[in-house]
Each structure stands twice: as C-alpha cells, then as structure tokens.
C-alpha cells in the first residue's frame, strides 16, 4: 500500500540529503513519530512530500525507508499558488498513491493538491484552524500597541494586523479544503464541531498524535525534581500563542511566588543589540520587550533557543507548570 503524506515541514532525513545536515527543532515532531510507527508495517510504502526553499525544482530523494518529493516553495505557500498544481499532478502520476494524507489545512500546497488531483482517496488532518483563530490573532493587544511598536521588519513583512488579514485569507482556502474533503482526522471536540459546521457530510475520524520515541522512554514528571515555580511555554513567537497574556499575569503570580520564572522555547524574539537583530526584530517582539520592561520582568523571562526532542523533553520534566495558552484553535489549555 502506497501512502503519500503532504506535510508542512521538511523531514530531517530529507534535509540531510539536500544540505548535509538536519535536526528537527520546530513543531511537527508528531509526524516523525507517526512515520516511524507506519514504517513498522511491512506492507506500507511511505512517500513524504512538502515544499521548501532549499530546492528550485521538483526533487525526488531516496531515504533509508522513505521516498521524498520536495516542491520548490516559489512565491509562498501562505497564499494560493497555482504553480503547485502541475507539480502535484506530476507527483501523483509517478507515485500513484492508494491513500493521500494531508497534514494540516493551514498552507496552500495541500489545497493545490486537492484542486489538481482527485479527492477520493484523500484524508486531511486538523493541526490548527486558521479560519477560526484569525479573529483572535492579536487578542489582548490594541492597535495602538501594534503601531507604537512598528519596526523595520514590519515595514517589509507587515504588522500583526497584516498577519491577521493573511490568516483570514488562508482561512478561505482552508474552508475550501474542508468542503472538498470526504475524510477528516481531528483530536478535539473543537476540531469536530468546526469541521462539521463547514462540511457535515465528511466522515470524521478521531486520532491522537504520536510523539517521537524520546518521549516514551519511561521518564515522568515529578514535582520533587522540577524547578519550583517555573513556567514553560513551548512556543511564543507570534501573538496567537499568548505570551503577552502570560506576562500580564506574571505580577500577580510574583506576589505569591516571588521566585517564579518563565522559560520560552525558541529564539529570543526581543533581541535588538546588533544591527542584524534590529533588522529582524518584529513589532510583536518589540511589544514583548516593552512589556517585559514595563512590568519589570527582565530577570524573570528566559528564551531557551531552538530545542531538539531530547531538550524539549527535559524542559517539560523540569517545569513546574506548562502554559499552552492559545486563543480559539485546536487546543485551549492553561
């Protein structure tokens, strides 16, 4: 059985084949776990395809057990890109998959496959619903917060208000994907309710994600060994992840727990010491920096840098509290 995956990330093995190195230090690790599980089945051939700016033409790569098709990113996969359609037809004709699994509805290359090829053997899985979350993209910030933190990067790339508009546009082809789909995979009642509202005729399949093997080595969180009163955020580089809301709550937390600390996975979005950092500083990063200073939290916030699976696991084990605050998406926990 041939299964074609269409993903939003370049798998580490494919990156190694392209540029000689590769380690996943971003979201999407559950796909590696699921791929490893599928590869235990002898009757399954897995083909993984994505878009990347590391190639300029459609590239086929042979991994140890997985065949990869990497499409050139082109203009962007954040908006409708008709160039993907002919490439997907080429991939489909060469692979002739029995099943196509599109991981996520956030990007236009999955939408392009459904437009270019038959949807009869396609299942889409919900990772995040941009059509819903766009309304709350910078919830907790005012437009004045956006304008007074305008940066050079905002001039080139746009402010969070522009990003919200882009989310809304992406939400339109996301809804089109859901309307076309005959099968949808989700994890939460929110996934089910939102997709049913768009396409009540699609068959819904519940399926939790599989993590990478390192998360199943028997380690378990223990209060005795955690860093007391530490709060961990697994990502927070754009407003939807709610870092600004956690910072606003921190003065109240500090009244009761003066030694409380916030640790955030990922690069430091507030750094602006060098010219390069000043150029790359986003308006949201500037807003977070001002908020930290206003609330006198300079010694209470740490960015860890990008983490691999083992490093992420250690952060989960060390933290006293995990804050996975997110406004109106597939997850809402705090």
Regions found by a protein language model. Name each.
Residues 92, 314-319:
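Short alpha-helical donor nucleotide-sugar binding micro-motif in glycosyltransferases
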Residues 2-6, 99, 116-156, 185, ...:
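Active-site proximal beta-strand in glycosyltransferases
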Residues 196, 210-228, 314:
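Acidic anion/phosphate-binding donor-loop and adjacent secondary structure
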Residues 205, 275-306, 310:
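Nucleotide-activated donor-binding/catalytic signature segment of Leloir-type glycosyltransferases, i.e.
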Residues 182, 317-330:
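Acidic donor-binding loop of glycosyltransferase active sites
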Residues 1-55, 64-66:
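N-terminal subdomain of nucleotide-sugar transferases
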Residues 146-183, 193, 197:
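Membrane-proximal helix-turn-helix segments that form the acceptor-binding/catalytic region
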Residues 4, 222-241, 247-254, 262-265:
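Conserved donor-binding/catalytic core segment of Leloir-type glycosyltransferases
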């Amino acid at each position: 059985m041939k299964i074609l995956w269409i993903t939003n990330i370049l798998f580490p093995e494919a990156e190694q084949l392209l540029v000689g190195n590769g380690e996943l230090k971003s979201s999407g690790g559950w796909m590696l776990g699921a791929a490893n599980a599928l590869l235990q089945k002898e009757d399954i051939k897995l083909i993984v395809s994505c878009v990347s700016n590391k190639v300029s033409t459609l590239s086929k790569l042979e991994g140890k057990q997985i065949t990869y098709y990497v499409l050139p990113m082109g203009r962007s996969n954040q908006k409708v890109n008709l160039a993907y359609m002919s490439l997907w037809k080429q991939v489909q004709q060469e692979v002739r998959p029995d099943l196509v699994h599109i991981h996520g509805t956030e990007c236009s290359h999955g939408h392009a496959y459904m437009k270019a090829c038959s949807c009869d053997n396609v299942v889409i899985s919900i990772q995040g619903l941009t059509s819903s979350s766009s309304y709350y993209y910078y919830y907790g910030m005012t437009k004045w917060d956006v304008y007074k933190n305008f940066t050079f990067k905002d001039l080139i790339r746009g402010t969070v208000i522009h990003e919200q508009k882009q989310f809304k546009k992406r939400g339109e082809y996301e809804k089109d994907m859901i309307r076309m789909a005959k099968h949808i995979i989700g994890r939460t009642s929110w996934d089910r309710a939102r997709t049913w509202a768009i396409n009540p005729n699609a068959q819904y399949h519940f399926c939790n994600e599989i993590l990478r093997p390192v998360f199943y080595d028997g380690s378990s969180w223990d209060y005795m060994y955690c860093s007391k009163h530490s709060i961990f955020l697994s990502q927070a580089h754009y407003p939807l992840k709610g870092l600004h809301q956690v910072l606003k709550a921190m003065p109240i937390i500090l009244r009761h727990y003066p030694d409380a600390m916030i640790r955030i996975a990922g690069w430091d979005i507030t750094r602006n010491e060098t010219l390069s950092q000043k150029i790359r500083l986003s308006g949201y990063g500037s807003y977070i920096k001002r908020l930290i200073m206003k609330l006198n939290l300079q010694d209470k916030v740490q960015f860890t840098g990008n983490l691999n699976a083992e490093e992420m696991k250690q952060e989960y084990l060390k933290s006293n509290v995990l804050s996975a605050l997110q406004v109106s998406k597939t997850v809402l926990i705090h």
